[in-house]
């Protein structure tokens, strides 16, 4: 079994003094159903699972129930599991197919006899009202593909290594060179394998890159099917075109999405909701341009200027030629890792709670990422994939600008930890050391 960080959050939810229903959100194929089942097997005597896609007739259970007692009677007739108060988890899966759950969950929680877990895909587009459940009734946990640390766990790398990395990050100390080289090798693997559980499981089992790429293509095919099934009919072609264009757009020099690639003379206003669909479905990650790199970043966001990434770097690398994937796996220094590195960093920062922005100025240059930490400090980040990682004109210009008051910049690249002036250089695998959860 793959070890996941969300397990700690599930433990905290169960031990909280005030009971709430649990909602685990995230893209399809990231392991939501598996992790809830595994958690339930460890902590409950009985698990009642209702899947609204496998059994669509179950939606009728929630057709105007009078109260919790009436609904629980219906549930007991629908499942083959005894509902024992205090010892049963009732798990509603694929809840995007049962919008009535929004009204039902409040009185089920008030009843108090059982614990409830909800999960599903595309909740951001299909079940927006789920987040309108009154405060105190629902605990929402976001789940993502495996980050680099979780991937390393699958490769038998323990917490002691990451404790050491956290110390090096905090104290700006070099990582032991042997450990650094080993982690860079693992990071090259991660760039190809990514963090989709089925892909990682396959790689752990047989090490076959061919099998990895087949599973990755199947996942992307499933995402395309979701577009055909859940998006509005008039939007489907554009949404699919946008999704399929991500790899080529990230290979452009500025990586910014060009609307004319979707359709000649296309304007943002015509497809704004199509980009939102992909982001809200958790299959894409957006970084928005800002007018200036100052807090609060959200206030100067330009919605029509953005970079779009896949939710998993393995899906991106799997879109390129097999030779490219093998070159990445081998750490070939002659290829351009730019888009792959940047997608991996975007994915990592998003999984650690950050909204993503970037800054582009004709005069000052472009910063790959801007994030805002818990203290509302803006942190500029450049991602470099080659030996020239110490060349960063935009970073230097922005840090020197008297109106921006930025004290420190970070460069993530194929390097060890070092500090020169107000720029901190970090190995790219340290992107996960930034936290905003």
Regions found by a protein language model. Give the residues of each.
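Pre-Walker A adenine-sensing motif
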Residues: 1-16
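Hydrophobic positions on the alpha1 helix immediately C-terminal to the Walker A/P-loop
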Residues: 35, 39
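Interdomain motor-coupling "hinge/lid" segment immediately C-terminal to the ATP-binding subdomain
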Residues: 128-251
